[in-house]
Design a protein with these regions (language model features):
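Nucleotide-activated chemistry modules centered on ATP-dependent adenylation/adenylyltransferase
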Residues: 1-245
């Protein structure tokens, strides 16, 4: 099932022995991608973009990955959304109106500069939504030249000119979950009935998951975003009112 993903990775491995992988720690696409990349590259730097640093429920995934893939490096950088939160004082975070705004492209270039690695891998899939489908399908044509100067098709997964690749481009969530199960990898984190969506501090399912499983992580989030506590309080009040009826 994943021969196409392996073919994409193999194409890039002919160009470089080192890659940057944007890695969410607990998400299914990141878990599967690291397993697929590890046999093909000498150096892999996993870049984790955080909203709140040092959350234990995320760190268990980092420890698992380091144990299974001992040569992998991890680098933590602020999520691009965090800069916007700070600029506007979102959910009570300490506000700085002069905070410079960063995009994913800005962070990518900074990480390239810090690591000396050019090629970047992300877990984007066409099935994620219309914008990603349009972007990835545009890579079906020639997207640049390889290191030998030959024109190369992107196979809807490789941007040769910008040196970015997306091995999971044509797969669905169910395919990725099957790969994880079949290869004995750590299951991705789930909040309620949904898959992990990272550190979504406005998601009641995420906050309740932490409340019952990692209460110290919840307090860390509240210490940075004090107004996030209101989301949880409102939900509890709603449940209390329903019980009274």
């Amino acid at each position: 099932m994943f021969e196409r993903a392996k073919d994409i990775i193999n194409e890039v491995s002919k160009e470089t022995d080192s890659v940057i992988l944007f890695h969410s720690l607990s998400g299914k696409d990141s878990i599967a991608l690291l397993d697929l990349l590890y046999p093909k590259f000498r150096r892999i730097v996993c870049v984790y973009m955080y909203i709140v640093k040092g959350l234990e429920h995320m760190e268990v995934y980092r420890r698992w990955a380091k144990s299974r893939y001992p040569n992998v490096e991890f680098m933590d950088v602020p999520h691009y959304a965090l800069y916007s939160y700070i600029k506007h004082g979102y959910l009570g975070i300490t506000r700085n109106a002069k905070q410079k705004q960063w995009s994913l492209s800005d962070i990518t270039e900074k990480v390239r500069e810090m690591t000396g690695i050019e090629w970047v891998c992300c877990g984007f899939k066409q099935s994620d939504g219309l914008n990603r489908r349009l972007m990835l399908r545009s890579y079906g044509k020639v997207t640049g030249k390889d290191s030998q100067g030959n024109d190369r098709e992107g196979k809807e997964a490789i941007q040769w000119k910008t040196k970015k690749f997306y091995p999971l481009s044509t797969y669905y969530n169910r395919d990725v979950l099957s790969y994880i199960s079949e290869n004995g990898l750590k299951n991705p984190e789930c909040y309620g009935v949904a898959q992990s969506n990272g550190t979504d501090i406005t998601d009641i399912n995420y906050l309740r998951y932490l409340q019952f499983n990692y209460p110290s992580d919840l307090e860390k989030i509240f210490s940075v975003f004090p107004l996030a506590r209101i989301t949880l309080m409102n939900e509890q009040n709603k449940k209390d009112n329903q019980n009274e009826k």
